[in-house]
Regions:
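N-terminal phosphate-binding caps/lids of nucleotide- and nucleic-acid-binding domains
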Residues: 1-173
């Protein structure tokens, strides 16, 4: 029927979902096989960097800078890509709040502002960030799929992410 998406489109959605699950749960071993071909395999060894290698390949994995930040209400860990691996769209901007893959304009802006002047215009960075925060500071019920979130302390969230990204990019040799 005309309402069914093509097999390729569906496979693309599944592939993306598997990548998001593997990246947000490096402690779990995933193997995704499509048409007898292994599309994704992760070891479950707790290493986000190894999952990034499995999903995105060596070129990306080699160009990562590790970030770690903590304040009284949030913790940020993960990797930001060196500016030279930026891309023409936002598909490489992945971040997880309390283990859940989400989208949020404030986080996206903080990340991209952190790269200002370091990537060309209309280029977007590679990031894989795990953000942990208290549930009281977070509203996940904005969207039925819980993909969008809102924060009680938007300014503090922006500042923490911006400074974490900016610092690692500008203080490297």
């Amino acid at each position: 029927s005309k309402f069914l998406k093509s097999d390729m489109t569906e496979a693309g959605y599944i592939n993306t979902l598997m990548e998001q699950l593997a990246l947000s749960h490096p402690e779990i071993s995933f193997k995704y096989i499509q048409n007898r071909q292994v599309k994704l395999s992760s070891s479950g060894n707790y290493s986000v960097k190894d999952v990034i290698y499995s999903v995105y390949g060596r070129e990306i994995a080699k160009a990562l800078l590790e970030v770690s930040y903590e304040n009284d209400f949030m913790k940020i860990e993960g990797f930001v890509g060196k500016p030279e691996i930026s891309r023409g769209n936002r598909t490489f901007e992945n971040y997880y709040i309390n283990g859940r893959y989400v989208k949020n304009k404030i986080i996206t802006k903080a990340i991209e502002d952190g790269y200002k002047g370091l990537v060309m215009q209309h280029k977007f960075p590679f990031v894989s960030l795990r953000i942990e925060m208290d549930g009281n500071d977070l509203d996940v019920n904005v969207h039925p799929a819980k993909r969008e979130v809102r924060f009680a302390r938007e300014t503090e969230v922006y500042t923490a992410i911006y400074e974490t990204v900016r610092k690692v990019l500008t203080h490297r040799e």
